[in-house]
Curated annotation (Swiss-Prot):
Residues that, per the record, bind substrate: T21, A22, S23, G24, K25, S26
Protein's job: Catalyzes the transfer of a dimethylallyl group onto the adenine at position 37 in tRNAs that read codons beginning with uridine, leading to the formation of N6-(dimethylallyl)adenosine (i(6)A).
Organism this protein belongs to: Erythrobacter litoralis (strain HTCC2594)
Top-level taxonomic group: Bacteria
Residue positions binding ATP: G19, P20, T21, A22, S23, G24, K25, S26
Gene3D superfamilies listed in its UniProt record: 1.10.20.140, P-loop containing nucleotide triphosphate hydrolases
UniProt keyword annotation of ATP-binding present: yes
UniProt-listed PANTHER family: TRNA DIMETHYLALLYLTRANSFERASE
Key words, A-Z: ATP-binding, Magnesium, Nucleotide-binding, Transferase, tRNA processing
Protein name, UniProt field: tRNA dimethylallyltransferase
Subunit note: Monomer.
Amino acid sequence: MGQTPEDWGEKPPVALIAGPTASGKSDVAVRLALALKKHGRDAVVINADSAQVYADLRVLSARPSEDEMRGVPHELFGEWDGAEACSAAEWASRAKEEISKAHFTGAVPILVGGTGLYLRTLLEGIAPIPPIDAAIREAIRALPQDEARAALEREDPDASKRLAPADAARTARALEVVRSTGRTLSNWQQHKKGGIGDRVALHPLIMLPDRKWLYARCDRRFELMLDRGAASEVETLLARDLDPSLPVMRAIGVREIAAWLKGEIDRPQMIASGQQATRNYAKRQYTWFRHQPPPDWPRIETFDFKLERVFDGLFQY
């Protein structure tokens, strides 16, 4: 039997398990939920991975199976159809609902995932940027990248220094914001709204295992996905003829398997490129989670740890 909402005090608890793909987050989340259950506390796992939100990517997103869930409630897994793009703001809105539901029933919400933007949006909120003028957006998107960069250097020098020269999408975004609103993107982002970080008692854990071990696991996982039907999953996606710019079509493994299905590359090339794409993604996530979260968030580099020690605050409610 879980606790009642009154038992939480002023700030109800939220557990957070984050880190790169293939780092073992899902397993730790379930272990934590079961450990809490032994202490008389219910828990629910809430997905914070931008690929696992899509119903079309059960295999390629490594969504936990029923056996892996071990009877623990899991929410926001496979909730979006691939024809829709799930933005960070949309995910955060749904996550807030699931967190509130869990707290209302006395359960501990356990956020688990590797999408830093999702987590940051949920905890810190989003900048209330007004809609961008359509004519301004169209004009900026039509600019060659070198002209867009030159304009950004003049109109938002800080953004120009911060963004990579080849990052056309973010360059255009920064430029359209300053031209449409008269304020820079960084200025807007200093006034975020809607975050829950100051309203909950956060119990975070960052999974940062040995990189060599992580990359080897990425390689094994991609091959396992193929054994579990990833090619059929991509074949079904291709048959839907979705917009190639949609997130579901840009998910790790989709492009590589699609190229193989179309006869553009052979199977060994597909496996090698899929594994490389997975490792590259894990590397970017690893770097982000090592440096971006607050320094006082625990970082774990080995699985040889006691949940009750890392999440001691959760077991004291």
